[in-house]
Design a protein with these regions (language model features):
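Mature extracytoplasmic enzyme cores
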Residues: 1-170
């Protein structure tokens, strides 16, 4: 209805991409339709240590800095327990479920298929309802920035290291 009235008055209508901030989860529809899109760990939180603790707990990745190089000691962390050095311990962080995310958590925007599911869920609905006005009364659709909170950490997705090595060769 709004698009038709705007057309009659010569007013442009800009469509917001979805339900709420941040963009990418379509008000909970993306995680509902694509369960693999959330809670695989969306970040890696860094803890630096000069002595590797005896109880490493939920460490996902452990790097030892030696001079100007890095050594991945994740597989043999227990052998280094109690030793001193320049250790970088990373733990997975997870978005919490909440009402803001439609009862789900935020999605992993780096996971293949998430963007496609978002477009299918949101843009196809707009196209069906008012697609004949795209480029006319509706000059465009705008989006919010994604939620990539990783203060003190790294943005992460399950195949990050594999893709990095494939792209950069190391």
């Amino acid at each position: 209805h709004a698009t038709e009235v705007a057309r009659q008055y010569g007013i442009s209508v800009w469509i917001y991409d979805e339900n709420s901030y941040p963009s990418g989860f379509a008000g909970g529809h993306v995680p509902a339709d694509y369960p693999d899109s959330f809670n695989q760990g969306q970040g890696l939180e860094l803890e630096r240590a000069t002595q590797l603790p005896e109880d490493i707990g939920s460490v996902f990745l452990c790097l030892l800095r030696e001079n100007d190089s890095w050594k991945d000691i994740t597989e043999e962390m227990t052998e280094y327990a109690g030793e001193t050095g320049d250790f970088y311990l990373y733990r997975k962080t997870y978005y919490e479920k909440g009402d803001w995310y439609g009862g789900f958590s935020y999605v992993d925007l780096l996971l293949p298929g998430v963007t496609e599911k978002f477009i299918e869920t949101t843009m196809r609905g707009y196209e069906k309802q008012v697609g004949n006005q795209f480029g006319k009364t509706i000059p465009g659709i705008f989006t919010d920035e994604p939620n990539i909170v990783t203060s003190g950490g790294l943005r992460w997705t399950p195949d990050l290291f594999e893709q990095f090595e494939k792209r950069w060769g190391y």
